[in-house]
UniProtKB/Swiss-Prot annotation:
Subcellular location as annotated: Nucleus; Cytoplasmic vesicle
Induction: By a subset of cytokines including those belonging to the interferon, interleukin and colony-stimulating factor families.
Disulfide bonding pattern of the chain: none
Biased composition (Pro residues): 37-50
Protein name (database record): Suppressor of cytokine signaling 1
């Protein structure tokens, strides 16, 4: 009896605790109340770019746009285009190379697309490549060219040999690239269409018709 009365006493609810239990809201009543709708927060407005806030200036004509687009595609295929390489990075890569070694990279100047970095006798230097009136020329030179690679070929073949061999990202070139270069050098890019080849090989030759 004593044990049973003790258990009953332990399980009994004290009068002081009863009002507290009655005052606590039940979970069923709180869950039945409708939830407040979630309103999406408005996205902050993105400010429009100010005129001239890009790296390159606006193209003057659609022909200029096509020429730069074509030049970019040729640069991607040439192997010595180093993209957004800095001036310091370009000079460090050229420092131990022979005189005349060069590479093409993006210019950091707002009014130029590309820059030419070359190892001179006095050390590496960089020259801006200007694009004006649909033609390319080096900074400080009056000689202009329809194509950036014609400009490079001109300075490679010049008597003073300002440019030598390009610094390629891959030192070992694929055999098909070497064959294409020799064919272009042998017959000239103006005669590539006359070579009796299937369309696939002819397209490959014309995809980079330069001797560099």
């Amino acid at each position: 009896m004593v044990a049973r009365n003790q258990v009953a006493a332990d399980n009994a609810i004290s009068p002081a605790a009863e009002p507290r239990r009655r005052s606590e809201p039940s979970s069923s009543s709180s869950s039945s109340s409708p939830a407040a709708p979630v309103r999406p927060r408005p996205c902050p407005a993105v400010p429009a770019p100010a005129p001239g806030d890009t790296h390159f200036r606006t193209f003057r004509s659609h022909s200029d746009y096509r020429r730069i687009t074509r030049t970019s595609a040729l640069l991607d295929a040439c192997g010595f285009y180093w993209g957004p390489l800095s001036v310091h990075g370009a000079h460090e890569r050229l420092r131990a190379e022979p005189v005349g070694t060069f590479l093409v990279r993006d210019s950091r100047q707002r009014n130029c697309f590309f820059a030419l970095s070359v190892k001179m006798a006095s050390g590496p230097t960089s020259i801006r490549v200007h694009f004006q009136a649909g033609r390319f020329h080096l900074d400080g030179s009056r000689e202009t060219f329809d194509c950036l690679f014609e400009l490079l070929e001109h300075y490679v073949a010049a008597p003073r040999r300002m440019l030598g061999a390009p610094l390629r990202q891959r030192r070992v070139r694929p055999l098909q690239e070497l064959c294409r270069q020799r064919i272009v050098a042998a017959v000239g890019r103006e005669n590539l269409a006359r070579i009796p080849l299937n369309p696939v090989l002819r397209d490959y030759l014309s995809s980079f018709p330069f001797q560099i």
